[in-house]
Amino acid sequence: MEIYEYDGKDFCAVMQYEGWKIGMLRYGDRFSTYNCVERHLATDEAFVLLAGSATLYEEDQSFEMEKCKVYNVKRGLWHHIVVSRDATVLVIENSDTSKENTERKYFL
């Protein structure tokens, strides 16, 4: 049995296996405001709110996340997540997701 945890800020990949990884996302500057969007060119990305509150933005829509529901952002869609200070979000994506296959746009 392997057990992983993360109680830091921002995002951390806590476990990887073959072609996928699980990360934990917590409050940090990057996730405190809706000031950018990103899209992954090689993977879908799934989010599960475990604690706190979060808003998931996808192109021209926003979703107030509900705990323990899976929100899957399809490959290539622009998105961003904003979380409360007490939030914890589980993130699942391909293990090779990186800056090389992700595009990011910032708003002025």
Segments predicted by a language model, with ranges:
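Short beta-strand His + acidic residue motifs that chelate non-heme Fe in jelly-roll/DSBH
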Residues: 56-57, 73, 79-84, 89-91
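A cytosolic small-molecule/anion-sensing beta-strand core signal
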Residues: 50-51, 67, 85
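Double-stranded beta-helix
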Residues: 2, 84-108
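A short glycine-rich, His/Asp/Glu-containing loop-to-beta-strand
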Residues: 3-37
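Short acidic-glycine-tyrosine-enriched beta hairpin
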Residues: 59-76
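Histidine-centered active-site/metal-ligand motif
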Residues: 38-40, 79
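Short, conserved beta-strand element in jelly-roll/cupin
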Residues: 41-56
